[in-house]
């Protein structure tokens, strides 16, 4: 994708997720360091960006004027104020990873001619194992969207979904790393309470999650129930645990947690 701008991708906000994207794009050799420019109002984040040898912008307007695609990675409560600052500088394409910030709302401030891409990555992106859901405005050009899609796909898995599913998808991958960590933590605490060495239990647990995930990935067409049945055989130990989950209606608990997660995403939407 060609551009007349000095930088290919400019970051407004470069905290945990923004920096993970920047580092991932460079690590995967999708972009060179000199093609990235960063602005963050936190000095510590700017120092980190400087240490990474990324370009440094003096403010939001500087990013918009010099980057072909502007990546918005700020807190939802700060988004409108930043968009107002960008209005005069008309970014060619805005990539937003801000939860709940709709394409229509972005274009209502920046103008309907602005190309907009929304992305929802998750934290394993930091190690190139993330998953990202994306959607785009009707006027977004194929070159711009393909460029961003492939960037995220290079850091894990990427899928295009309708914008009206962006809030619901948070309960599928956006928040799910925390679910997984919580489940592991519960099992780990229980193991330690039974006298099992914490380091050994954690190592075994983590590898079990990695291995189980890879099995699912390598057998994408196989029903998940079959994987469960292969472990939870009749009369064995695992089936006792699975039956307990069912008796306590774990599925209902997960559904309720997802409902509240999605509801909060909808509350943040505008």
Residue ranges and their predicted role:
Residues 2, 206-270:
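NAD(P)-dependent Rossmann-like dehydrogenase/reductase catalytic/cofactor-binding core
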Residues 105-115, 131-169, 181-219:
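Internal alpha-helical scaffold of NAD(P)-dependent oxidoreductase catalytic cores
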Residues 44-45, 78, 187:
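Conserved short alpha-helix immediately C-terminal to the canonical SAM/SAH-binding motif I
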Residues 1-58, 62-65, 130, 192-193:
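NAD(P)+-binding Rossmann beta1-loop-alpha1 motif at the extreme N-terminus of oxidoreductases
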Residues 21, 37, 52, 60-134, ...:
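Rossmann-like NAD(P)(H) cofactor-binding subdomain of soluble oxidoreductases
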Residues 36, 63, 79, 197-205, ...:
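Small-residue helix-packing motif on alpha-helices
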Residues 169-178, 228:
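A short glycine-threonine-serine/GTX helix/turn-capping micro-motif
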